[in-house]
Amino acid sequence: VEVAFVRNGKLVRVERVVPEGVEQELHALRELVQGPTRLERRQGIRTAIPEGARVRAISADGEVWLTSFSRSLLGMGAPETKVTRLAQIAATLAPLGDQEYASVATEGRLVTSLRLGMRPDVWRAETGENDYQYVVRGIQLRLWLLGYLDRTDVTGSLDYSTEQALVAFQGWEDLDRTGTVTGQTQIALSTAARPEPTAHRPGKRIEIYRDRGVLLMVDTGEVVRVVHTSTGAGGVTPVGAFRVYVKALMSWSVPFKVWMPYAAYFTGGIATHQSPDVPSYPASHGCVRLPEGEAERVYRFVDVGTPVVVR
């Protein structure tokens, strides 16, 4: 394998022999944190990885390397030094498989996510619970890879779209739905997988999980989007298998005297629709409330006849 170090401010690769029976990716990262040999140092090769850093875990999940290091990896150091550390990790992992991204955690808590083959962004970290750091853009990139956010919403700003994505993620993972980057959220993000639907069938379908407050958009057995939702208070949204029977860009609710944008009705007078109030608990009179932006996405996704499963 090749390990990425630094010489004269540029990344250089040095070869390491992988012992028999050891996974190449694990050995590569172990060699990375161990640093250059004495001979390599005499040749001007250095590393930005701090002495004493350790590899905790590495595994592959589809197109993503999931990595975890000791907390010291991103402890002391100037912002540019931390960017170089991440660049060394990315450059070491890039040749080892078909993965295009890497998530980087410390002690099992996600810090950031990287696009392999590209230099990491400027280090702008927030301080979370117990002083564990995280990079907002890296959190957003991870949420996008898991199906909770648009790629265009990876902006580095904790905005409304990111808050809704976090609530959806927390609901699916059975965490407190705060819409913020809690410690438990960092832990879950470090190893989470994209949600799986209940059935892998051809065509499009919608799955709604009342207790989790989550709607899954499923296309040919793959979850293409995970959306935060609020269903009926007291469990009044019926459980069962239904189909969309009518769509309306703007529907008027006669009993509640309110407009419901992007309504897709699937049983009785119950529909998915946009709402300005989508709390992290069941609060509606039976309909499936969706956040601004997500409601239109669901509306465009479904057709009359699209299956809707409520659980």
Where are these regions (language model features)?
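Bimodal "functional hotspot" detector
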Residues: 1-138
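A mature extracytoplasmic/lumenal domain signature
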Residues: 7, 59-62, 69-73, 106-108, ...
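Extracytoplasmic/secreted envelope proteins and their assembly/folding machinery
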Residues: 26-33, 52, 83-90, 136-143, ...
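Sec-exported extracytoplasmic/periplasmic mature domains
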Residues: 33-38, 91-98, 141-149, 167-175, ...
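N-terminal post-signal-peptidase region of extra-cytosolic proteins
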Residues: 39-56, 83-89, 189-204, 227-231, ...
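Short acidic, glycine/serine/threonine-rich helix-capping segments at coil-helix boundaries
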Residues: 129-137, 141-188
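Cell wall/extracellular polymer interaction/catalysis modules
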Residues: 158, 167, 171-235
